[in-house]
Amino acid sequence: MESEQRRKRKRIYKPDSTSNSFFSVRSLTACLSFFVFLLFISSDRSPIKTVSFRPVLNVPVSLLPTPLGLTRDSFDTKSLPLIVEDRVLLPDHVLLIVSNKVATSQNLDCVYSNLYNSHDVVLKPALSVNQYHRDKSIVRCQLPPNNYSAAVYLRWSWEAAEGVAAAAPASVVSWDRVVYEAMLDWNTVAVFVKGLNLRPHKESDSSKFRCHFGLSKFDKDEGIVFTTEAITAAQEVIRCLLPRSIRNNPVKAQGIRVTVSRINAGEDGVDAPLPSVAKVYGAKSYEKRSNRGKYELCACTMLWNQASFLHEWITYHAWLGVQRWFIYDNNSDDGIQEVVDELNLQNYNVTRHSWPWIKAQEAGFSHCALRARSECKWLGFFDVDEFFYLPRHRGQDMLGENSLRTLVANYSDSSTYAEIRTICHSFGPSGLTSAPSQGVTVGYTCRLQAPERHKSIVRPELLDTTLLNVVHHFKLKEGYRYLNVPESTAVVNHYKYQVWDTFKAKFFRRVSTYVANWQEDQNQGSKDRAPGLGTVAIEPPDWRLRFCEVWDTGLKDFVLANFADTASGYLPWERSPF
């Protein structure tokens, strides 16, 4: 009898031995991972990267074999597994970060699991796919149906339905509270954070923050390997020192995940680290041009669905002397990559950077300033509906090519000025009801009399380490100041109030962190809004006649004189009817 009871007790406790074995294996795996991580950062040979090692062999391309007809360009990325690293729940879609390149959203499905029955799934086509951080991709999926999880995963439409519900449980983080980007900056890292709710346009106390580095997602503090102090904090950017063990060789930080925690007056004094989808990356441009001369003048902009304006904006400003372009694309779906490719074929130096984070323009400009610093002496921040104009002086001919570059180059060695500011004139629809075929510079010629705001061109290496900015101008290093350029020397034509079909897109979403969306009943007196409009995109009957106080054809005349084809009269960005 007693022996029978002992056998039963053994059977009852058998699962516990399995559980103990599981935790032992888990602990062993964690220890081995930690050991490998330490080995990587202590080695002088093996920086952590997301790309594999490729030894350099100088062999003529024509002599290289191509087994099975595969090349880098012809390789079918659809044959690679769809490994989702992170998921972020945004207000209007779910963002997935995929560990490899995905060429197209065609035949790519987002898979949603029922919250109460994992075998009940719904498939919806992916909204879009973009390259992200070199060899990764971002995939956008629709919001989940009611009672379905936002922890979306992916599959190709031709894959067998069997096993779709067998995916492991996955996590999803909210856009309201997440570390979303991190950029290496010498022996520090600039960490971009949503949810700290720091004061806008002001520096905050950095002593209240810490950065944590590791290989995992920091679930329950399990992934933290190193912790360092923050040295600056402003708006959505926390700058921290790199861990001491890799400070002398910052490249080893590439690919390490980072998060931020806040020190408070709570019970334990420290908040839990924020969820993070951010891994440390360096500026790709720094690797390319660290030993070469810098461009004199570059431009950075953030846009959404404005590909149709790019050709005119870039062609015109390239003539004025802009040499390098950084386009931060905020979830466009209007074929912008094709436009960028076409411009590069015409020898314009344009890079499109996917910036999927909504309401994060200031952070995006801080990111761009870091990225461009090693390439550019001067960096202009202005929108694709804003055009610099250098009016001719009385008794003088029109200024020639590269005139804007020449203007800023006069101050490249200044020990005083690190920013050049120009005022803006806001133009209205100018009586038009449809978009002008010759572009905005020729089509819109009536504006408000009083100037508004200003736009800036800065020296990136002389920006304050906080990277604090108010959309179009930055806090400068101590000892430097800005220069206001007289209106007679340079001005920006801002084609702000265009024909209604173009203008109404502004109601969808404003990109600035600290500017309310126009559908919201907030700050209706703000200069960001159009006077007289409410919160609904309804065209006023007299829209085409509004914002017209001064007829100004200065830039129109300049463009027609310098850009129009002498035979046909067509402008370079104008679509020929033939």
Curated annotation (Swiss-Prot):
Origin superkingdom: Eukaryota
> What are the GT92 domain coordinates in residue numbering?
295-531
Q: Which Pfam families match?
A: Glyco_transf_92
Alphabetized, the UniProt keywords read: Glycosyltransferase, Membrane, Transferase, Transmembrane, Transmembrane helix
What GO terms are given for molecular function? Answer: glycosyltransferase activity
A Gene Ontology term for the protein's cellular component:
cytoplasm
Tell me how this protein sits in the membrane.
Single-pass membrane protein
* Locations listed in the record: Membrane
Similarity comment:
Belongs to the glycosyltransferase 92 family.
State the protein's name.
Answer: Glycosyltransferase family 92 protein RCOM_0530710
